[in-house]
A protein has these predicted regions:
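Active-site lining segments of carbohydrate-active enzymes
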Residues: 160-286, 393, 400-406
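Long, well-ordered core segments of solenoidal/helical folds
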Residues: 76-88, 134-152, 201-226, 261-281, ...
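Low-complexity, Ser/Thr/Pro/Gly-enriched N-terminal "stalk/linker" regions
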Residues: 24-96
Length: 646
């Protein structure tokens, strides 16, 4: 079991073995902005950078929480009788036996939600009635062997999912808890001492032993990326974890030299993330990961700027603005976003983060988009970011400015990301087209070089399915046995009857976008293995209001093995009643896909959705439209036209 688990786990998409299509650009923006000596002289002393009231400043908190005070207190009241859950050893081991991470995460997350609600309620009310339950939550948390998730503990030296008390692992959740509990200590340590001084001492020691010391002593946490090579993937874990480390050191470390060294260490690490990202700002992890990739990078940069009184700030750098504006440009409408890889098709982002990021980089598109999320979809009214107390406090502080901002979606008719190789185009008659080129070893990768999605009046009709509930299989060598990861369940051809392959070498070439002609084209042959026997497969997408979307596949094969099969994933059930024409309709929005009936036989598969992560988005079933070539030919051209149904 142990050997098998070690072999299977390649945590988070081949953390150690993933590669990038383009080598890093060694910008090192943070290190160029400030040296260690600059940081030492720039850090604001005595925590004077903190703009939130002290716990005992009740007038300050009444003003600060304002209209949210009652709401925040009520959330805490619901947790006054909360029974703190024990995460059992068998809950951790479940990840090894069945692959489930939910068994461990459910009680753990329940505890964290209760604790965060109680903390915000006590800050808002200030009468002490939530303190005993906060103490219970803090005490219970400190008694745990680890703050990391079972799915992440397999990166311990033991390679097992049960916490090893000899090793402190800092993952996303351990970092989140470290940051949250650092704020808890900052606000309440004197209140804890009124009950018993051992409480705050125990909490402070846990933070030292679990977070502060390991971060400075170890350089082998994969997300630190200190040893990153030009081809090493650096994903959302980096800014997310480093933000938490920065928070902990700013709040807890009293030695200014040690604090400065830790702050500079986070700068060196976050530079690796910025270096990995392309100048165009595209997020290869997709919109649903943006909040913890570029969005968490923003939190980090803002906190760093606050702590240095603006002396260490890189918000003026074009790449930082580009990374922010990606989230606004990737929004389709009515809650739908462009989703590639593991990203969900539903979302839009956290309005508060998007707004503040937009302010920092002077992007009116981001600020207006954030206002849109609140005014049109109401999702931004929830200012409580759970255990991310920094975001909650910042949401409250900036809410009035946000709701006074004019709401609008970006007006651009296209967006082109030349390095990330994403392309979005819109027409005046309601079509929104999104496609990608890229390579098959991106962060949270699916084998999807050349795929596309098509929306009509913000309704997804030809879709990217996304990903199901994460299990052990998701981040193992079994990943591509999951149907939704495979190219044959994307809007792509099976050439000679075969799908694309996983690996950095499987990539697009000759990728071109013509903004005047509204044409996106690529050669996707390189995304298929040698066994496919394909020389070229040039796909051209052309989007014109009057003619809709025209897709042209021009190909040359070395030899013939099996029929080519062109797949289209659809939300609506395909209507094949007319030869050469397929109607795809969902909720009164319909398109017609036209093909040459002399070239293809059309059919479709029904794909039941039993995974709640997918069924919550798409419902009970999806469909795969299949155009199977009638003739086996070495060279040829296929054309498909998709237009709105009148």
């Amino acid at each position: 079991m142990q050997k098998n688990l070690s072999y299977k786990i390649l945590l988070l998409l081949g953390i150690l073995l993933s590669y990038q299509l383009y080598a890093h650009d060694y910008r090192n923006l943070l290190q160029k902005k400030a040296s260690l000596e600059n940081v030492k002289t720039s850090l604001v002393s005595n925590k004077q950078w903190i703009k939130y009231p002290n716990y005992t400043d009740r007038a300050g908190w009444d003003k600060y929480t304002s209209t949210f005070k009652t709401e925040l207190i009520q959330l805490g009241v619901k947790q006054l009788n909360y029974e703190w859950k024990v995460v059992k050893a068998t809950d951790y081991l479940e990840y090894e036996t069945t692959g489930s991470r939910v068994v461990m995460e459910k009680p753990f997350t329940g505890n964290l939600t209760a604790l965060s609600d109680l903390v915000m309620a006590e800050l808002s009310e200030g009468k002490g009635r939530f303190i005993p339950q906060i103490i219970n939550g803090v005490w219970q948390t400190c008694e745990m062997s680890s703050w990391a998730l079972s799915a992440h503990l397999v990166t311990q030296k033991s390679k097992r999912s049960l916490p090893d008390f000899n090793e402190q692992l800092i993952d996303l959740t351990a970092g989140d808890l470290g940051s949250f509990l650092s704020w808890t200590y900052y606000f309440f340590n004197k209140e804890f001492d009124k009950s018993n001084p051992i409480i705050s001492k125990k909490l402070r020691k846990n933070l030292q032993d679990r977070i502060l010391d390991p971060y400075m002593e170890r350089s082998d946490y994969w997300w630190q990326a200190f040893n990153a090579q030009p081809s090493t993937m650096v994903n959302n874990w980096n800014p997310w974890c480093n933000f938490n480390m920065l928070t902990c050191y700013l709040l807890l470390e009293e030695n200014p030299i040690k604090q400065a060294k830790a702050v500079y260490r986070t700068m060196e690490s976050v530079d690796k993330f910025i270096n990995y990202n392309h100048e165009d700002g595209g997020c290869e992890e997709g919109p649903s990961y943006w909040g913890h990739a570029a969005g968490k990078m923003y939190d980090y940069l803002q906190l760093l700027s606050n702590a240095t009184n603006g002396k260490v700030s890189i918000f003026n750098e074009p790449i930082i603005k580009n990374m922010g504006e990606y989230i606004a440009k990737s929004y389709v409408g009515n809650g739908w976003v462009v989703n590639f890889a593991d990203a969900s098709a539903k979302g839009g982002g956290e309005a508060g983060v998007i707004f503040r990021y937009g302010q920092a980089v002077k992007s009116t598109d981001m600020q207006s988009f954030a206002a849109y999320l609140i005014s049109r979809e109401k999702n931004g009214d929830d200012i409580n970011a759970g255990r991310d107390i920094f975001r909650t406090l910042e949401n409250i502080a900036n809410h009035n400015s946000l709701i006074q901002t004019k709401a609008a979606l970006p007006l651009n008719t296209y967006a082109w990301y030349p390095q990330t190789q994403f392309c979005y185009m819109k027409t005046s008659n309601g079509l929104f087209f999104a496609a990608k080129a890229g390579y098959n070893a991106e962060s949270h990768n699916h084998n999807d070089v050349g795929t596309f999605s098509l929306y009509l009046d913000a309704m997804p009709l030809i879709i990217d399915v996304g990903v199901g509930t994460y299990t052990r299989q998701t981040f193992s060598n079994e990943r591509y046995s999951i149907w939704s990861m495979q190219s044959n369940y994307h809007n792509l051809p099976m050439i000679n009857g075969l799908p694309q392959q996983f690996g950095a070498e499987y990539k697009a070439k000759n990728v071109v976008f013509d903004s005047l002609k509204h044409i996106f084209s690529l050669d996707m042959a390189g995304a298929y293995s040698k066994e496919v026997l394909v020389d070229t497969w040039n796909r051209k997408y052309e989007l014109v209001s009057d003619n809709g979307l025209t897709i042209t596949d021009q190909f040359e094969l070395k030899d013939l093995k099996d029929a080519n099969q062109i797949n289209f994933m659809t939300w609506g059930k395909p209507n094949l009643s007319t030869d050469g024409s397929v109607i795809i309709e969902k909720e009164s929005k319909a398109i017609v896909l036209k093909y040459n009936p002399t070239d293809f036989i059309a059919s479709y598969d029904v794909i039941p959705q039993t995974d709640t992560r997918l069924s919550n988005v798409w419902g009970k079933e999806l469909y795969r439209l299949k155009l199977i070539a009638k003739k086996l030919v070495k060279t040829g051209t296929y054309t498909y036209q998709i237009i709105p149904k009148k």
